[in-house]
Amino acid sequence: NFLLADEINRAPAKVQSALLQAMEEKHVTIGGTTFPLPSPFMVLATENPIEQEGTYPLPEAQLDRFFMKVLIDYPTADEEREILRRFNTISSDSIKQVISPEHVRERAGLVESIYINEKLLGYIVSVVAETRKPSRKELKKYIEYGASPRASIALMKASRCIAFMRGRGFVTPDDIKEIGADVLRHRIILSYEAEADGKSADDIVKLVFDSVEVP
């Protein structure tokens, strides 16, 4: 049910393409035989941003298939101490199942039932549209290509997840803002001017949200 694609940018393009096709179509074909993938089927891919030699960066269209891109920094001192404590105490024999596929599917159904009103759907559409045809001059020079409709769908789903985790049955504008960078940072293609000015994708996402009126 859960696949870890470690350092996916070290896999050749053909392997990347096969994985992303499986993510999209939920089945794989081997020797003319098609095998359905289990439900749920989730992929977590990692990239090492430091060492880029010998890597195969994912094309933008393939990156778009990933629901979110989460940045992982160094652990805090407390987190690192906990890593050291656990290092010699956890073995594969002590790892137990904590949730069943049925429970995951059940909770996914609950997330889909979270209410999001028409004004907030319009807000999501406006945010994503701002990445394509920016109203601010500053944004126009920094964005080469904006986000696709997949971004709107992902932002709606992710904001529902945030509301669910906060114990609410409805989405608020803050839910959308909170998860915005994770959903959009890999879907916006920056211009050379943005790179020259030292602007990150997160900087641009903040400008995008600042440019759109909250309903």
Where does each model-flagged region fall?
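Short alpha-helical scaffolding segments that buttress acidic/His motifs in well-ordered protein cores
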Residues: 83-84, 124, 179-184
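The start of beta-strands in P-loop NTPase/AAA+ ATPase cores
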Residues: 1-2, 186
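AAA+ P-loop NTPase domains with strong preference for DNA replication initiators
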Residues: 86-171
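Canonical AAA+ ATPase core
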Residues: 2, 7-15, 23-115, 160-162
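C-terminal engagement/docking regions of AAA+ P-loop ATPases
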Residues: 133-215
